[in-house]
From Swiss-Prot:
Catalytic activity: Hydrolysis of proteins to small peptides in the presence of ATP and magnesium. alpha-casein is the usual test substrate. In the absence of ATP, only oligopeptides shorter than five residues are hydrolyzed (such as succinyl-Leu-Tyr-|-NHMec, and Leu-Tyr-Leu-|-Tyr-Trp, in which cleavage of the -Tyr-|-Leu- and -Tyr-|-Trp bonds also occurs)
InterPro entries for the chain: ClpP (IPR001907), ClpP/crotonase-like_dom_sf (IPR029045), ClpP/TepA (IPR023562), ClpP_His_AS (IPR033135), ClpP_Ser_AS (IPR018215)
Protein family per UniProt: Belongs to the peptidase S14 family.
Organism, scientific name: Neisseria meningitidis serogroup B (strain ATCC BAA-335 / MC58)
Keyword annotations: Cytoplasm, Hydrolase, Protease, Serine protease
Localization (cell): Cytoplasm
One GO MF term attached to the UniProt entry: serine-type endopeptidase activity
Protein name, entry field: ATP-dependent Clp protease proteolytic subunit
Catalytic-site annotation from UniProt: 102 (nucleophile), 127
Predominant localisation class: cytoplasm
Function: Cleaves peptides in various proteins in a process that requires ATP hydrolysis. Has a chymotrypsin-like activity. Plays a major role in the degradation of misfolded proteins.
Signal peptide residue numbers: none
Amino acid sequence: MSFDNYLVPTVIEQSGRGERAFDIYSRLLKERIVFLVGPVTDESANLVVAQLLFLESENPDKDIFFYINSPGGSVTAGMSIYDTMNFIKPDVSTLCLGQAASMGAFLLSAGEKGKRFALPNSRIMIHQPLISGGLGGQASDIEIHARELLKIKEKLNRLMAKHCDRDLADLERDTDRDNFMSAEEAKEYGLIDQILENRASLRL
């Protein structure tokens, strides 16, 4: 896994065959930990999907831990992660550290029920999908895009309502504008199941 613009630490492991060097994220992948850090893009989603599929092939019966620190991003890229989380056999436990906003919050809520966590000072934000970049073209084309955006909004609200055990009307109301929550508020809303003060408080 490569992360641009900053140095990724290397971990040295000793074995009977000598030393092996891993970048820190590859080492954590051995512990079945997958990271989504930064915007949800086609590239970051592809990395997450590949790691989820790899971990399923390694052990289809052992949980995967998906750590999220993301401001959100592409709906289609995020849905590729979402569909893979549901497609694979292992339970996917989600954990927010830092922030989970927009598509990041949606993926956080989509973890296995009872296994969705946040650290105490995490921030979670939900809202309706946005059009990124300038939208131009003929009026009929803009109308097509508007209809598609409304379909996406309805689908995301319906799925998140299911994950949060809430009425669809609640999500339609609460995602109308940027809706920021603390970890405690996210738990009360149903986006997560538990706030982790430390590793000892983890209950699976």
